[in-house]
Amino acid sequence: MNGWIVKTLGLLLITSLLLTGPGVAKASETSTFSDISGHKYEALIEQAAEDGWVNGCPDGRFWPDRPITRLEYAKMMLAALNIVPGSQRAKEVLQSTEVPKEVLSLADDGWASKEGWVELGFASGLVVLGDYGSYLVLPHDEGISRYESTIFAVRMLGRFEESLTMVVEEPPFDDLVPDMQVDNFGVIEIAVENGLISGYTETKFYPAESFTRGEAVATVSRVLTLLGRN
């Protein structure tokens, strides 16, 4: 009887090991987030999460097709550059650039301000208040447009000043017109030439369309590659 019990326990132990072994664990770890399997940017999102510059929502999803806000995008870029509140790199950025008090006074008491991302966004030069015309506050909770996201990306690449001096005789897409919506064709030219972003079609850019979290990860990943950090 005792021998039978021992054999039974042994079989149960072996079965348990098989069920919880590497094969099963691997299946449960195929994706960091529950909603990106098969997504166009799945591999890039996985890599970004592994590198520590993106995270998902409390429900375990990443929401790759959800529009990203201005400060969410700025935070993603700063984290990708290792400019994280409290880090040595962040301290160096804050010491090298004095953020005007009037700018800090515009920040609300939301998560980005409390955690220090707003100050870093301005200090790093990724966020420039003048981009928002007569706004007295940074409209950070609004979804960022494709055109504005391109400005952020070219700033992260370090080529924004260059874009201001470029002479673009013919816009790269036929839905780009010189108005309040698009006032710098140079950033789009630089972004497209370097593969940071592309048009929806060969002739349409849709500058006012929202920019998604998945697209944001893809763009930041491409900038990092150009900077030699990937």
Please name every model-derived segment.
Residues 4, 18-40, 55-74, 78-117, ...:
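Feature responds to low-complexity, polar/acidic, surface-exposed segments characteristic
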Residues 52, 195:
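Phosphate/pyrophosphate-binding loop motifs in nucleotide- or prenyl diphosphate-using proteins
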Residues 1-9:
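Bacterial N-terminal signal peptides that target proteins for export
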Residues 10-20:
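Bacterial N-terminal signal peptides
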Residues 45-48, 77, 121, 189-191:
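A short amphipathic alpha-helical interaction element
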